[in-house]
Amino acid sequence: MRPPTMQYPEPAQSDRPAAAAARVGIRTPAEQEAMRLAGRLTAEVLDMIGPHVVAGASTDELDRLCHDWIVDRQQAVPAPLGYRGYPRSICTSVNHVVCHGIPGDKRLKQGDIVNVDVTVIKDGFHGDSSRMFCVGKVPPHVQRLVDVTYQALWRGIRVVRPGARLGDIGAAIQSFVEGNHYSVVREYCGHGIGRGFHEDPQVLHYGTAGTGMALEAGMTFTIEPMVNAGRREVRLLPDGWTVVTRDHSLSAQWEHTVLVTDAGCEVLTLGAGERPPA
């Protein structure tokens, strides 16, 4: 069944038409190189902004720093700005905000957790990634949510290879998250990415192994699980963008863009010094 209609990206659908498979792009070697560049620049923005995610900083200030870096330093384009009317260059989702939080004058405080979501367009291709940042020291139960979500992302990444199915990704993430007594948001999902910001296929973060589209070398898509400390239900605020947990529980998200290769997959948005969890 189809979940409620929401925006940015398209709502997750478990019943996508089979015809969607015909629309999934297989990147040429030249396009793969362009995707690597866009991914590298996206990771660079997140590396840059990390030290600025501190108590007293406003999310609008973070947006301005990222915008200027992308436009002035990278000679690139912040994809979210103006996308379907979105008013800022990044998304900043604090505490119980699940995704698509709009930067504003809200100032961060000690103990907050913040997801910063960055998408860069360079030479016509997109890179998309998000990271969690903790403002100062957070309680152990909060750190655990952040860590489990990161591990869940990598559980999904590790099953990506030619011949694997989209359902394998969702099943790996869902079983790990629920095994750690958290819940997976179902209304939003990963997506194909390339010349378009949001392309086919949709990459659900829940599902059944062995189902869904078979992966092929040359596909590029995001994996971006949103994990709630409480129940999985979310609601959309009147601004039309900000998604929050219905029960006001904390939520965390991590995202990478991946390329399916003959040998498995390549993560295009790795941060400086980032090492996959054991």
Regions found by a protein language model. Name each.
Residues 1-278:
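Active-site neighborhoods and metal-handling regions in enzymes and metal-associated proteins
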